[in-house]
Regions:
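Short secondary-structure transition hinges
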Residues: 95-133, 140, 165, 169
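Key DNA-contact positions within bacterial/archaeal DNA-binding proteins
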Residues: 45
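Hydrophobic alpha-helical segments that form the core
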Residues: 93-96, 147-166, 178-189
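Hydrophobic alpha-helical connector segments
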Residues: 60, 74-103, 153-156
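Basic, helix-initiating cap at the start of DNA-binding domains
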Residues: 1-26, 30-42, 56-59
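Amphipathic alpha-helical packing segments from all-alpha helical-bundle domains
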Residues: 67-70, 115-141, 150-154, 178, ...
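Hydrophobic/aromatic residues within well-ordered alpha-helical segments
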Residues: 11, 54, 61, 65, ...
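Base-recognition residues in the alpha-helical recognition helix of bacterial helix-turn-helix
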Residues: 24, 48-52, 59-60, 64
Length: 196
């Protein structure tokens, strides 16, 4: 039983890895399930067993990449001078990841088109909870205005996500990026108890 579970986990990881490459290179619509499975020596049956269908595989890939993005953004925030600067750095880092071709294609373009509203994705819900906890501490410490913490967290995360979506969909992402980050910082600054 343990060996079977281990084989299933390995097959799942192989399929996610192959899908990341195929979805980034060809896009979701053009990526063939047969090419995906044969690239890692598995059958369509393995894909269906692990993910239900191609859409389920995309959801697993998006969840993995989006979780990596959140972790990377949190690392950027941890390097900032204080918790407020950390919150701003996390949002800016998330927006900047829209320049990564894999993130751009899979998470910000194909993900919403196939999976729907990103704010409903499990990885986004997890990120929202982390932001809400940070906001609660900033309010308690007097750094932020005493607004509803969940509302503020949802607006901050939504602003970063929508800025990243804008960058990804733009014909000139590198030109749009600084504008998006500047506007995100200005919007967030409105939540400060004592504006900079």
């Amino acid at each position: 039983m343990k060996k079977r579970a281990q084989t299933m986990a390995q097959n799942r990881a192989k399929l996610i890895s192959a899908a990341r490459v195929a979805f980034a290179k060809k896009g979701y619509a053009a990526a063939s399930m047969d090419d995906l499975t044969s690239a890692v020596g598995l059958t369509r049956g393995a894909l269906y067993h692990n993910f239900g269908d191609k859409r389920g595989l995309l959801a697993a890939v998006v969840d993995q990449i989006d979780s990596e993005m959140a972790s990377s953004a949190q690392q950027a925030g941890a390097q900032a001078g204080d918790e407020w600067q950390g919150l701003l750095a996390e949002g800016a880092a998330y927006i900047e990841m829209a320049l990564d071709p894999e993130v751009q294609r899979i998470v910000l373009l194909d993900g919403p088109a196939v999976l729907g509203d990103p704010s409903q994705w499990p990885s986004q819900s997890s990120c929202l909870q982390v932001t809400r906890q940070t906001v609660e501490r900033l309010i308690a410490g007097g750094t932020m205005k005493p607004v509803d913490a969940e509302a503020a967290a949802r607006l901050l995360n939504g602003a970063a996500l929508n800025a990243a979506l804008w960058v990804a969909a733009s014909t000139s992402p590198k030109t749009v990026l600084p504008k998006a980050v500047e506007a995100f910082r200005a919007l967030a600054g409105g939540l400060l108890a004592k504006p900079d």
